[in-house]
Amino acid sequence: MRRKTLEIYSVELDGTKDTKQLGQEEGKKCNELDLKKSSQKEELKKELDLDDHKLTSEELEQKYGTNIIRGLSSTRAAELLARDGPNALSPPKQTPEIIKFLKQMIGGFSILLWVGAILCWIAYGIQYASNQSGSLDNVYLGVVLALVVILTGIFAYYQEAKSTNIMSSFSKMIPQEALVTRDAEKKVIPAEQLVVGDIVEIKGGDQIPADIRLLFSQGCKVDNSSLTGESEPQPRSAEFTHENPLETKNIAFYSTTCLEGTATGMVINTGDRTIIGRIASLASGVGNEKTPIATEIEHFVHIVAGVAVSIGILFFIIAVSLKYRVLDSIIFLIGIIVANVPEGLLATVTVTLSLTAKRMAKKNCLVKNLEAVETLGSTSVICSDKTGTLTQNRMTVAHLWFDSQIFTADTSESQSNQAFDQSSGTWASLSKIIALCNRAEFRPGQENVPIMKRVVVGDASETALLKFSEVILGDVMEIRKRNRKVAEIPFNSTNKFQLSIHETEDPGDPRFLMVMKGAPERILEKCSTIMINGQEQPLDKNNANAFHTAYMELGGMGERVLGFCHLYLPAHEFPENYSFDVDTMNFPTSNLCFVGLLSMIDPPRSTVPDAVAKCRSAGIKVIMVTGDHPITAKAIAKSVGIISANSETVEDIAKRCNIAVEQVNKQDARAAVVTGMELKDMTPEQLDEILANYPEIVFARTSPQQKLIIVEGCQRQNAVVAVTGDGVNDSPALKKADIGIAMGIAGSDAAKNAADMVLLDDNFASIVTGVEEGRLIFDNLKKTIAYTLTKNIAELCPFLVYIIVGLPLPIGTITILFIDLGTDIIPSIALAYEKVESDIMNRKPRHKKKDRLVNHQLAIYSYLHIGLMQALGAFLVYFTVYAQQGFWPTSLIQLRVKWEQDYVNDLEDSYGQQWTRYQRKYLEWTGYTAFFVGIMVQQIADLIIRKTRRNSIFQQGLFRNKVIWVGITSQIIVALILSCGLGSITALNFTMLRVQYWFVAVPHAILIWVYDEVRKLFLRLYPGSWWDKNMYY
């Protein structure tokens, strides 16, 4: 019996067998650190030995050393409190804020910029140590690079700091006080002081202060939705009803809410040992994987660093072989590496992601982690919770059965379009029972509030019936006044019916009306007649069969079905002054008239089916993962399109072919409904097989730990997994997923804080918007990086020519800085506003290992095609400036040594003019300015061609993205300021530049545009060709 308890309990609480086998597989590949982390997570998922729900009161007293009547003694309670600690959740070890801040300072691009800054300072140190009259340019450049990292890091840290800690949100759920019996006295004590063995009392509206084994109960119902995902209130009693502690009715769980009734129970678990405590530990113990965009940025950093170091070392060797001093060669090496660092890209990517996050916030997607913006676009699997995410999170009347027909009710948010026949006399009787046999009431003062938005005092089912009646019949409270209630038996789990007796509003009819609703089979047992078309008829075999057929059909749709009946009590037996006694039941409860059935369901949101269809066309697999019943889960999955209309499960095929499930070929089924019980017995390989072979999957009756295992299974398939949810039970999976998406309205604080994104309108359809934005930002980041990398070659070539050919330096490091952080920042960001080129929601999600942010096609095209063309254009401007001042290009070759000697003040140009060191320096700065302007003019063309990767810019529209033109204007203004307004400030290394030099590079800019248009034309003409594979980035 013991083993059975543990085995069945594990269905809902964990998947230890799965994780153990998974750990054994992964252990072969993991290092010791990974194994240590795996064992820690294993510890969180281990099984609990709990059989308190099976014990009698006497056995419980003996086990916990308490007394049901007197409670614990204060002395014993103090001892237990000292032994077990307070009834509170232990916060996990916090990462110090300084560590969080430092992580922002050295991650991704940041490390590249830090290396660049340090190399700049080293270069200056080498120059200073060797007594060279080196400028402070390298010092300034190092400082600016450091500032870029620090400012961007502060911004990113601020974004992260806005997220609150998960554990604090769990703590908010904990009740503050509890009513406890100690020393035979009732006391109100802080909930933190509860210990195992305490006898506590709860009532409607209270939060359960610990895991409690109920001893006495009176009409107690609890809301377990935050733990199990079940929409319906769960009745609680002292009876042992199920082997599984999560299913039995005699245990109430820490932090769930008592909706109505009263109960007394014994505390059996406190703090971290409670179910909620284990979920809290599991959620905070799950580590976040790297986001796809973080991986891409790391990959990009490796590419840039690899290119920079390779070129630097190559030219270091060349410089040494050309007899340069080793110290000078080291400085050249550093200069080449720094020239390859895209200084502005860190800020550009951060700002671009922030802008997209703001855009998504306007569409009800609040992004907490900036990198999650792109992750949503990479998503290939969405594991969605059912209750409150796919559904409206409110019970709604879905179908009615009367007059031997099933009618469909309007389950939309308004319920205003009820199209079923309301002319029948049977409906008149049924609607009256629905309105009267109901304890729910609207809170006063809501007359001007729409019916569906009014606050109701009552459970979910009663609320659904009240609102349904109010929409169809009008003022229900007025109907109740006219039909005064004189007696009532509330619903309880033993009787399974609710009964009330009323005076009738007909002054000519002195009879009392008894109305009853409850479990259909129980209601039918009490009836001898049935109402058909307003007339009572004997309840014969045919009518009973019609009832059973309808009941099975409605139940098969996953709906909660209620039966309704009534009886007019004879006036001579029950006169006007008759005293009804509900304890002795001095009135008949048999030979009633059956009137009809009504079924309820938590209906899907109206926008969800379309959203699921869009996910399907976008190549995204939507998996439902819920704690609800498999029949209900499957019904909702079919209604929203997660399971297609023509898809069948193995069970469906078996039923259709009238054969055993084992005889069905599993490959014939497209859909699968997997329960927690089945999942518990699966190995990781079997789970992987299901995830790989079935395109349409529903997981039902799953525990929080199993949701986590499902997410891990999807990630083993190399899927980028998004998880949606709103309950505490979803938080571990939200944390583990590549992107966690919580509901903003109905979501618990725990779910919101575990998530990377919050849907402010709780609408699954908003995810589709987020996916589109995520895919668009990936495309646009590609364009931004391509635009940024292009000028790197134009900035690098001057150093190479300076070393090999010995020309005067064409451009300085400060000038490069003004390009990267001055003229190019706004245009780079402007590309984030570019619209889609094609319907990006009709393509498959990108493969995270094949579809890279920076691939070799992008690098080659940016560096070797456009980059070299841009370098040639900039050199043309440089040579033009020197030629017009008297230095022909041939005269500049190997002139560098003489050019830089301070004591040479009579250097002759091609015309025999003599140049002093100051005049040469001024001309050199003019060359810097000209080279800068040459790059800037060509970058305008580069910016325009980057608007698209395949389409012509005329197809895309030159003026659709007006921010691009703001960027171009900013480029020109910054260049004008530097070459005109600030040209006299020598520290900036700029000079006043003649107007004609601005137009020298224009032909090259036009050539860049024409060249790229030809590339795109061939891409469109020959899709899938060699050209397409090698020239499309």
Curated annotation (Swiss-Prot):
GO cellular component: plasma membrane
Assigned protein family: Belongs to the cation transport ATPase (P-type) (TC 3.A.3) family. Type IIC subfamily.
Taxon lineage: Eukaryota, Metazoa, Chordata, Craniata, Vertebrata
Species name: Cavia porcellus (Guinea pig)
Gene name as annotated: ATP12A
Subunit record text: Composed of two subunits: alpha (catalytic) and beta.
Tissue: Found in skin, kidney and distal colon.
Protein name: Potassium-transporting ATPase alpha chain 2
Gene Ontology MF term list: ATP binding; ATP hydrolysis activity; metal ion binding; P-type potassium:proton transporter activity; P-type sodium:potassium-exchanging transporter activity
Topology term for the membrane: Multi-pass membrane protein
Reaction it catalyzes: K(+)(out) + ATP + H2O + H(+)(in) = K(+)(in) + ADP + phosphate + 2 H(+)(out)
Localization: Membrane
Active site, per annotation: D385 (4-aspartylphosphate intermediate)
Membrane-spanning segments: 97-117, 141-161, 298-317, 330-347, 782-801, 812-832, 853-875, 928-947, 962-980, 996-1016
Major site of localization recorded for this protein: membrane
